[in-house]
Amino acid sequence: MSNQDLINCKSNSGLTYAKAGVDIDVGNAMVEKIKPFIRSTKRAGADVEIGGFGGLFDLKAAGFTDPILVAANDGVGTKLKIAIEVGIHDTVGIDLVAMCINDLLVQGAEPLFFLDYFATGKLDPEQGAAIVSGIAVGCQQAGAALIGGETAEMPGMYAKGDYDLAGFAVGATERSALLPSKDLAEGDIILGLSSSGIHSNGFSLVRRIVQQSGLKWGDYAPFNPQMNLGTALLTPTRIYVKSLLPIIKTYKGIKALAHITGGGLPENIPRVLPSSLCAEINLSAIHVPPVFSWIAKQGKIEETEMLRTFNCGIGMVIIVAQHAVETITQILEMQGEIVTLLGILTKHPTKKILYKGVLHL
């Protein structure tokens, strides 16, 4: 054996970052795969070129004069476990964007940019690229630029194939257009926009119900025979920006919005109400999608628990003045939204939400 062979042998026996489980070359390969998705989210104020130490956004180029910045962050929760087990990873990317962006929207903000955090035990470039492709689709739906993110390969932290996601979004609104407005009053009307399904809350309970039912992800969904169960449950969260933002910016008829996520109607509507007002909701008016009826029946879940765990068919609540109801409803329906007249604001000394009727589960 030559001296050079001895040197090569010694160098090959030494530890490397890749041998410890973190392969920088694989990470670089994934970056190349996702660049086209990222470029597809370009908008005024951002060039969406990645590789720097931070993402840049030009507020002046976005057309703001007296802006207030609004920030939000969120995740997808245990819906990810279904995505991992089914092997469909793009739709949870849309969920990630939706959970953050809809929270910006309720304060009247136009989404500007988005950043993601993707953590896994062993990086799979195809899996990662699928996730980012979904994030890009969500950003396109929201009009937000995907200006950066972090991919963390952490051996020993996650089981094989598992991953977690977190999203961070920033938007802006003119100071005068910040929601909720200060003129919320008794008699204002409460409208609801239909959800696309479960969205991204309550999946720990959903997964327990599926487990107890004995169903497999590949079985036909009992609530939708045209789809298998896994695909149906992975229907992505609806993003309401393109329907609501033009009304917020031009018509000025919306007084408040509430994104119906964890806690459902009873926890989220009161977040936008002043102390003197109460939301009176007619539960009988809600068209409950079949997936929620199946969940309630299969899990023997009471109405109150359904309402505080799931959106039950209403993904966004809108509060408007009575004179604006007809116009706003027409605009939203032209945008493809299903609008429900949910109720009215009343005065109550202690209650923040009151129910009439029953939820037709």
UniProtKB/Swiss-Prot annotation:
Keyword flag Nucleotide-binding: yes
CDD domains documented for this protein: PurM
Database matches in InterPro entries: PurM-like_C_dom (IPR010918), PurM-like_C_sf (IPR036676), PurM-like_N (IPR016188), PurM-like_N_sf (IPR036921), PurM_cligase (IPR004733)
Enzyme Commission designation: 6.3.3.1
Gene Ontology molecular function: any one: phosphoribosylformylglycinamidine cyclo-ligase activity
Pathway where it operates: Purine metabolism; IMP biosynthesis via de novo pathway; 5-amino-1-(5-phospho-D-ribosyl)imidazole from N(2)-formyl-N(1)-(5-phospho-D-ribosyl)glycinamide: step 2/2
Primary location group: cytoplasm
Domain of life of the source: Bacteria
EC primary class: ligase
Location(s) in or outside the cell: Cytoplasm
Catalytic activity: 2-formamido-N(1)-(5-O-phospho-beta-D-ribosyl)acetamidine + ATP = 5-amino-1-(5-phospho-beta-D-ribosyl)imidazole + ADP + phosphate + H(+)
GO terms (BP aspect): 'de novo' IMP biosynthetic process; adenine biosynthetic process
GO CC, any one term: cytosol
Entry keywords, A to Z: ATP-binding, Cytoplasm, Ligase, Nucleotide-binding, Purine biosynthesis
HAMAP family reported in the protein's UniProt record: AIRS
Family stated for the protein in its record: Belongs to the AIR synthase family.
Name of this chain's protein: Phosphoribosylformylglycinamidine cyclo-ligase
Record lineage: Bacteria, Pseudomonadati, Pseudomonadota, Alphaproteobacteria, Hyphomicrobiales
Gene: purM
